[in-house]
Amino acid sequence: MQLLQLLISGIAQGCIYGLIALGFVLIYKATETVSFAQGELMMLGAFCGLAAMTMLGFPYWLSVLATIAAMALFGVLLERIVIRPILGQPAFSIVMLTIGIGYVVRGLITMIPAIGTETHTLPVPYKDQIWNWAGLVLNVEQMVVIAATAVLCALLYLLFRYSKLGIAMQAASQNQLAAYYMGIPVNRLNGIAWGLAAAVAAIAGLLLAPITFVHANMGFIGLKAFPAAVVGGFGSLPGAIVGGLIIGTVESLSGFYLPNGFKDTAAYVVVLVMLVIKPNGLFGEKLRKKV
């Protein structure tokens, strides 16, 4: 029974990692660059939700929808104003820019008096609720994370499988030049990809905040989400979720069964093992370029 409790806890944490990793993969597939600002976008989403609930007095569900919409718009504007002008530059330059964006977002949050430097509780309706089922003590906050992740994955599957927008995004991710000559608005799709990644990061922040707290440093969890994207296969959306679940589960089990300190390094040990066994990740494809 203890093992099952640990697995549920690990799956819930892994869902958070997986959602942030989805943002990594969405942006990578759209622009072939890596955004290390995903953790800070998650943190910003949590603060937006907190502001909507406590300052604006919005009800919970309206706060969630408003936060997701606001972060999606922020992601689109970020791509248009900051990222798009330097596309075509060396990938290292874009990566460093995203790291800088993360620092700027965190710095701006900490500058807000009585908010940015404090730890806050997100007032959700299911805070601290417990379900007792078949001898298991289930944390409702964790179950909401798992359920919401499952629903979001289903919605993303429908988007990319059946909608014209999703199919166009897949085509652009395979070959942007060919997609451009076929009349697909590649630049617009890049902006949508950034907006979608920011919205998913906001959802992750709103799901994580009730389990932990809302604070300026919660964005550092993105450092655990990056290994999830690597394990799943950088470029695979299902792989991001599976990688997150693996990282979360290993982290939960190692934190209980292994000595102190192993929990924080478990994610990177898994990455090292994966790079040795399967360098392209579980769902990654081996790409060959003819010269």
Question: Whereabouts are the PLM-identified features?
Answer:
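Membrane-embedded helix boundary and interhelical linker motif in transport proteins
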Residues: 8, 30-77, 81
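Inter-helical junctions in multi-pass inner-membrane proteins, predominant
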Residues: 1-16, 159-160, 164, 190-229, ...
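Short, non-helical or kinked segments that cap or interrupt transmembrane helices
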Residues: 15, 26-46, 60, 88-93, ...
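Alpha-helical transmembrane segments within multi-pass membrane transporters and channels
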Residues: 58-101, 108, 242-247, 278-279
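Membrane-interfacial amphipathic/re-entrant helices at transmembrane-helix boundaries
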Residues: 1-20, 48, 58-63, 89-93, ...
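Hydrophobic alpha-helical transmembrane segments of polytopic membrane proteins
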Residues: 19, 24, 71-73, 224-247, ...
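Transmembrane helix-bundle core of multi-pass membrane transporters
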Residues: 85-162, 189, 253, 258-260, ...
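Helix-loop-helix "hairpin" substructures at the membrane interface of multi-pass membrane proteins
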Residues: 13, 137-214, 237-243
